[in-house]
Every structure is written in C-alpha cells, then in structure tokens.
C-alpha cells in the first residue's frame, strides 16, 4: 500500500474546483456574488462561447488593496468572517475564500482592481493556479475579472460541458436570479458582444421582477406580504392559468441569496395543488428574511441549498401565505350576477361578419352595427334570469336544509334528491377575516404549536393588491356571467355548450361540479355548512380501519363530517357536509378514510386537501349524465361564484373557449 502524502497546492485547488466550479455558470455566479458583496451599484457580465472561451465581470465596487488582491488567490482567504460566530451569522453571499483560487486553478485568469482613493490599480495574471504576472496599472475604481479557456488544463471536465447555447442558458438563469435578489443594482449581460439583458436599478423587488419576467407576467401576479416575530415573507405568485412546464419559474431567496430548497418548492406546489395540473409549475417569487442564526447556508459546496432551524414553520408560512393570496382572487361574479357590459363589436367579430358579407351569406351593410350580437342574452332573457327573479322552472327544488352551526334536531328532513345540484352547496362569499395563518385547531390535551403567530402586513398587502386588481381587471363586471349566456345544449351528455358574444364556450360538467363542491368544502370561514342526519348512521369497521379513523376524526370534523366513537370498532355519523348531503354516510366515510390513509405521512393541510378532493369527486355529476335545464343553470351560477373556475381540483381545465376566429379558421374562412 502506498504511503500517505500531502497533495501539492495546485492539485488541491483543482480538486476544490471540482466542487465549486461545476460549469461556466458557477464561475459567473461566484464572480457576480463577489461584486455584490463589494457594494457595487453597477455590474456587467460578458460571456463568449457559453463561458468556455471567456467570462468577464466588471463592477464599480470597493476594489481591493494590492496585498489583498494577491491574498484573495490563496485558499480560505476572505474578508467576510473572522470567527465561528461570524459564520453562524453570515450576511454576505461569499465567505469561504474558495472561489477565486478554484477558478484560477482551472483557467487563464486576470484580475484588475483599484480602491477609490488609490492612485493606481493592480493587475494580476494567473495560469492554472500559478501566478505569472503582478504589476501596477491604470484602471477605474472597482474590479474587473476575466476568466479565459475554462478547464483548459482539465480535459476530462471540459469534454463534459454542454453546447454553448445550453451553457449560456445556465448562466442566464444564475444572472436573472441574482438580479432579482438585488433589485437596486444595475445588471448587464453581454453575450457574443451583444447586450442580452440590461436591468437598470429598480425601486422595488416587484419592479425588478417585472424587468426579469416581463410586464405581462407581472400584470398576472398576485403580491403578498406576511410577517411574524422571527421572519418576513414577501413576494408574488402568478394566477393559476400562468403555468410553466418546468420549475425554472420558481424564484426563492433567503436573506438575499438565491436558493433551491425542495421543501419550500413543495410548499409552493402544495398551495397550487388543486389549481394546476400535476406536472405543471406556477410562477412564484419569494423573498424570505429571517434571523441568520435560524438558517445555515454552509451546507452545500456552491451554497445553493440551505438548512432551516425550524423547517416546519417556514414551510407552513410559505404555503399559507400563497394560499391566502390566491384566496383573495375574487370570483368573476359575486353571489348575484353582475350586470353585463354594453356590447361593442370586437375586431374578431368584425372580421367574421365581413367575411360573411363578402360571401353573400349576410344581408346587412358592413358599416351597420349589430343591434344585439348573436348569442348575447336578450333583455327578456336577462329579466327572466335576474338573481332575485322567481325560478322559471317548476321542477327546481329549494336548497336542502343546511346548518352552520347545526340545524335543530326536530327539523324536517331534506326533500328527496330530485336534482343533482343544491344551491346551498355554493361557496361562501369572500370573508376578509379568514386567517390562513391562524393556529390550527387541536384536540383537547394535544400539543400546542411552538411557532410564533404570523401577522399579515395588511397595509402593504392592500396597496399591492389594489395595484394588482387595477392591472389585471379582476372585477365582476369585466366578464359576462356564464349563467347569463344562452345554453346551446349538452354534447355527449358530458360537455355544456354556451353561446358567448364572441364565440363558443365548452364546459366539462364533471370538472365544473368538482370545483364548486371542492371550494364549498375548502374555503368557507368556519368550515362548510353541515346537514344533520335525521337518523344517525352507525358504521362498523375492521380494527385497523377503526384505529386509523380515530386518528383522523379531527380532520373529518374540519370538512364537515360530525362523527364519534360508538363503542368498540363502531362509529356514529350525526352530520355530513351540506354539499354531500345526498351521499350514503357509510360510503362517504369509508372513501374519505381510504383517502386519508393513502396520505398518511403527508402534512395535515395536504390530507385535508386530499379529503376535500375525494369528497368532491364522489359527489360531482359524471360524464355521460343527462342534466335538466335547471340543473345546468344552477351549475353555471355556482361556477360564477367560484374563485378558481378555470380548473378542477386536480388541475384539469373546466372550460374552453373557441372564438369566432377559431371557428372561421376551421372552415378556412379568411
């Protein structure tokens, strides 16, 4: 066996470079972070050939003393920390003193730097970790670092680099994330001698997010801000329809540092769980500020990952803040349908009408406006369907008796199930007092939460949300209510067809009803309304299922199932959620129990969502089921009152719109 020996410094630096310098993007990241730590207000990044040929960073920061410039090329030489206490409370992006020597060990490296009050600057040239030249030079205040021929002396690493465009994409991602984290700094990226990004210093993180993500994305983003004794979380999330195919749209920053934390990402996805399809990702920008003592950034070679002292509290805060922000999305229409907007002919409609005139299929003049567009509700239809009008259909039954709190024990039972829909099952109107950050209810004797209560910065949120509403026009009168549109009929007893002013709307009846029931179970303040059973149902379970049910009784209570032990392995059901009032209690409880067991190791809020999904799917009308006109109307009215009418709880689309232009293209009309 060979004797143990100490490796030479050059080899040590090349080994260290394998951890720190994974690819050109890692070089760009380390150099940009050094510029930010130096207090630069303007930073320029230039690359060539995806960073393999050249990476150059120029800043107007504090610069370095000549002695410090040479010392910075030694391993573990840094100005950021002096003691273990400094490491535990680190606030800078860099602190290990590994980046510059590691980069210089695998490239042809040049450093030019000057302090603001120095007469001359310092030039240092390094090749493969060996200092070749040191001299004075003229230069502006700040630092310029040039890295050429990356991995020229490590062929095994160089051959595994991807194509230039791919490496450029990685660099752009790092550049955008650091630019997003430090909005006041002017960032510029030059690729192949052409400016690819130029982000002037912004007044706020939201303004910088608009520069990076684009103005259209910013218009469809919902801001939020929450704060507690130990942390502050602010940011924005895109509306559910703003989906992406990958997770590159998730931007998470902890104390100004871009990080990739699986738990935080899962919390973001959990907040959108019932709003976007599985495999899709939302747009989210999160800025988390907390005591440096509560987060460890020294757990990954590239400082990409962090470890939280209280991960559960962070995850709950992230999910709750996003979910609360999404719940402030108003329904397109309130409990009473909004008055339709006056009709004005759109460009698509004019083009469609003109094509018919040209082909002799329409007799009116081109310049003559339509008195009422095809498919728009007539005055008679509107009057007949006013929210306060008498029901036009004699078969429409009254809502089943519901209670929240419970109905009187002597009340008469609900009417037989003549209709598939119950107006009492509609979601409750927005309640500004709903607090998604309140301490969860716990059973008597259960452990109290150890996390400090979270308070919402209502003033900041209100200002931001008013701006958001003004930009996105989420007001009730902006879109005609679905219930006010003429119903063409059902297609294959599965899809409801509506005639819109500018086209055709197809609605998946099962997905729409699922969304209505899910929101009724999930979002009303105080929990969903309950329907008390005239005759309590007794359920006998196998011992294993009985033990599991005892564990999940508080969760079943939260979604509206009132159930208690009846001795041994028997249970008695006294009430069920009003939207599920016609479901057999035994079958409902067994199905909910199976869903809870399937998510046994999931967080409490995840299991609650799973239970609500199961209940909604169990109760919703099926594809292929014929609906009466009054049932279709009730479904459309419920959809108008729903916050997230565009998707079902599983993230599938509820409706699809074909404009007149889409139809014209199908028939090759121009």
UniProtKB/Swiss-Prot annotation:
MF-aspect GO terms: ATP binding; ATP hydrolysis activity; ATP-dependent DNA damage sensor activity; mismatched DNA binding
Basic and acidic residues: compositionally biased ranges: 379-389
BP GO annotations: mismatch repair
Role according to the record: This protein is involved in the repair of mismatches in DNA. It is required for dam-dependent methyl-directed DNA mismatch repair. May act as a 'molecular matchmaker', a protein that promotes the formation of a stable complex between two or more DNA-binding proteins in an ATP-dependent manner without itself being part of a final effector complex.
Region annotation Disordered: where it falls in the sequence: 363-451
Family assignment from sequence similarity: Belongs to the DNA mismatch repair MutL/HexB family.
Name listed for the protein in its UniProt record: DNA mismatch repair protein MutL
Keyword tags: DNA damage, DNA repair
Residue ranges of the TM segments: none
Record-linked PROSITE patterns: DNA_MISMATCH_REPAIR_1
Family annotation (Pfam families): DNA_mis_repair (PF01119), HATPase_c_3 (PF13589), MutL_C (PF08676)
Name of the gene this protein is made from: mutL
GO cellular component, one term: mismatch repair complex
